[in-house]
Amino acid sequence: MVNRTILITFTNLKLVMDKLIAAFPNNMIEALSIASSAHISKNGREIRNVVITGMGGSGIGGKIVALWLQDELSIPVVLINDYTLPEFVNHDSLVIGSSYSGNTEETLMSLQKAHSKGARIIGICSGGDLEVFCRTNSYDYILVPGGNPPRTQLAYSIVQLVNIFVQLGL
């Protein structure tokens, strides 16, 4: 027989998730506001490929945007959901690190590799080590609000990724 405490816990979790999902339209409005004030420098470098690295909820936005824009973009977009980085990444690559917490080990490792290869890097996070990495290395980054499960913050990820593509004229 299922324990009553477990049922109450699941019911409470459902209520919390329902509330977070219902907040999606407001998150979209806030994400658009953040995007309108974010500045991504063009820096004159030609971008020949894009790599988006992110795990779990932070990586889902990259999948959606890559599929959505695949017929619109003239350059390839590759998604990474682990520690790796494609061998082709170089000075002409844009590597976008998406980590809601800013502390996702796999994303940070991929960005370290991209940094060592001279790639252009942009971060999307709510703070953490990713913000520090970007600030320390003078990389552009966009801060989004923290405090919720990454899978419920999809609006921020999608809007900021599209914002980056638009600002860079991709």
Stretches with model-predicted labels:
Residues 44-170:
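Glycine-rich phosphate-binding loops that contact phosphosugars or nucleotide phosphates
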